[in-house]
């Protein structure tokens, strides 16, 4: 029995709702997607609750589900995945946090957030991270290390005795709100110590960054200064995730540029590749991702391709760029089909919906597409939120990999 390759393409935040400016259509309905529509016509489509009905997934919990794990059982915080995705080693007892370079102003003795992403485009990020690592390497005997992820994002790893991830964020998650003080979420010495350390990191980052030459240059150009690091999503890796090799016997690779998602992929045993020109934004070189995926399929059983630009555009409420990135994903699928049609099982899905009118993740079901050479087609003939309702699939996120394994002739029998 011939085993087929497996290709999973995820359009981050690609799911949407009706957009009035598009004549009450979704970006997927408006975008030109000949390859997605042809795959839908020849394959099976439907709706998927990535986590559970009505539950807005984070990108980390969503990908745990797409990789076949129950996020309610395995999720222990976003920070460790972000750190793994930028190549950090996160050991037992370490605390990892997700961070944003942000812009704050001093108002009435408080630091008030005016831009949570410091304009998002931040070519000075490596320079700022270097300054932080030189001037803020230790707090209360705890080693502190900053890692640049993509755009405005950083990961921070704390190493030392007596740490806890049971602490709140310093990121207020809203513009116009003051920077928060991290609080212990449990009355333990470890949580209290970690909260103090996180507060010290946050407010010292402001002292280091506010007058940094890179920020002076940004202000001169009319750009928002990246003058603080806001922290959130503390987590510890208490238990090792089972790998795809251990669970399914497959060798897998991930193609993308978003640290958080690549960290989840790395945690489940995938080899991680960031292609030339991949940025994690709308300016990514998606053709480079497609070429890289084709090459990797020569040596790997499964390749996962992540397209982040759809989500970046959604969070900005940018309909035009969302449509552009959907069409980029369609190109990636078409390019891969040119090489592996008949030789692979293809699955395409968002990891969650990020409607451009909401600008945040929502719990809407997302359109999912499955195509394999001998799969019996259903009645769906286009790929979008409305058209896939004619399809046969109505699944959870963690069911998708089982379907891919089944149609690639790799599924293991359950029972005698």
UniProtKB/Swiss-Prot annotation:
EC number, UniProt record: 5.4.2.12
Pathway(s): Carbohydrate degradation; glycolysis; pyruvate from D-glyceraldehyde 3-phosphate: step 3/5
Lineage top rank: taxon: Archaea
Protein name stated in the entry: 2,3-bisphosphoglycerate-independent phosphoglycerate mutase
Enzyme class: isomerase
Pfam families: Metalloenzyme, PhosphMutase
The organism's taxonomic lineage, starting at the top: Archaea, Thermoproteota, Thermoprotei, Desulfurococcales, Desulfurococcaceae
SUPFAM superfamilies: Alkaline phosphatase-like
Organism: Ignicoccus hospitalis (strain KIN4/I / DSM 18386 / JCM 14125)
Role of this protein: Catalyzes the interconversion of 2-phosphoglycerate and 3-phosphoglycerate.
GO molecular function, one term: phosphoglycerate mutase activity
